[in-house]
Design a protein with these regions (language model features):
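Serine-dependent protease modules
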Residues: 2-245, 254, 288, 304, ...
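PDZ-domain C-terminal substructure recognizer with occasional recognition of PDZ-binding tails
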Residues: 211-218, 260-264, 270-276, 282-317
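A structural signal for short, well-ordered beta-strand elements
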Residues: 111, 198, 251, 270, ...
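Structured functional modules or segments
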Residues: 255, 266-267
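Acidic- and glycine-rich mobile interface elements
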Residues: 246-255, 273
Length: 317
């Protein structure tokens, strides 16, 4: 008689498959992850960094390199390199550094926009000084927002942040969050609580930020000069426009482009250059370098009327 149970995967088989996947990811990602030390011993920052180009460019977290000064990167094979910080962008908590003379195999870059909740992820970094550490978990949530700020008092929300239960600890910042195919889909940035870690996603927006940092050492953003938040649209307007919400202007900075365009408190911005905006993050994503000094048409709900205002953003100071 045939033992039919032999064809049914056992719990051990499932665990072996899980372990095989995590092991495979670790073997492919670990050689590209560095332990990063910045500044003077005992006074600087420490974290992780990930090689993203064959000629030694690394991505890390902006807060890891915020102390400035000299930096070094050490890898699992024992090699160590002096590192130059090329540029940092506190408003995205991303930074780019370059290991002098390094020719290390980079990680493959993935696309966080393709992630699904429940998907396996592997975190690789150097928590608490323990180099080459690997933890695994799942994508616990998508579309989270993480508040950031720079030294000039500007605040911004990093959109589409990845939430994971893969264990993250101090020192993991700047390390890799990889998918099951060993592709970099996030840069670990924050420990929000027990079993709750956050990573900046790798997507079109962050790749543009990294390219700007590699090219210019900084990120240029357009600036309107408003504070605002999401506001539901009246049903009739929502039906007419095909969107449920817009960005209500709560404050207009004196002397700003928004003030020059005659935006008022209480106005609800529903589109910019014919692109619908339903929340602050939508508006924020449109404030790119290409729009600095360019006239943009704002469609605004003012009372019961839709009006069009022209605004010319300046560079975020």
């Amino acid at each position: 008689m045939t033992d039919r149970t032999s064809t049914i995967p056992t719990e051990r088989d499932a665990l072996d498959a899980y372990s095989t996947t995590v092991t495979s990811v670790a073997e492919r990602v670990l050689p590209s992850v560095a332990s990063l030390r910045v500044g003077r011993a005992g006074r600087g920052g420490a974290g992780s960094a990930v090689v993203i180009t064959l000629d030694g460019f690394l991505v890390t977290s902006a807060h890891v390199v915020a102390q400035g000064g000299s930096a070094s990167a050490s890898f699992l094979d024992g090699t160590e390199y002096d590192v130059d910080v090329v540029g940092a962008d506190p408003l995205s908590d991303l930074a780019v550094a370059r290991a002098r003379g390094a020719t290390i195999e980079p990680v493959r870059i993935g696309n966080a926009e393709q992630l699904r909740v429940g998907q396996l992820v592997v975190a690789v970094g150097n928590p608490l000084g323990f180099s080459g550490s690997v933890t695994s978990g799942v994508v616990s949530g998508l579309g989270r927002s993480l508040a950031t700020a720079d030294g000039n008092g500007h605040r911004r929300f990093i959109e589409d942040v990845i939430q994971t239960d893969a264990a993250l600890n101090p020192g993991n910042s700047g390390g890799a969050l990889a998918d099951w195919q060993a592709r970099l889909i996030g840069v670990n940035t924050a420990v929000a609580g027990m079993g709750l870690g956050l990573a900046v996603p790798m997507n079109r927006t962050t790749e543009a930020i990294l390219s700007a940092l590699m090219r210019n050492g900084r990120v240029r953003r357009a600036y309107l000069g408003i504070a605002g938040g999401t506001r539901a649209l009246p049903p009739a307007v929502a039906q007419r426009l095909g969107q449920k919400a817009g960005v209500e202007v709560q404050e207009v900075v004196t002397g700003s482009p928004a003030a020059s365009a005659a935006l008022r408190g209480g106005d609800i911005i529903v589109s910019v250059a014919d692109v619908a905006v339903a929340k602050a993050g939508d508006l924020q994503r449109l404030m790119v370098e290409a729009h600095i000094g360019t006239k943009l048409a704002l469609s605004v709900l003012r009372g019961d009327h839709l009006v069009t205002l022209d605004v010319v953003p300046v560079e975020l100071p």
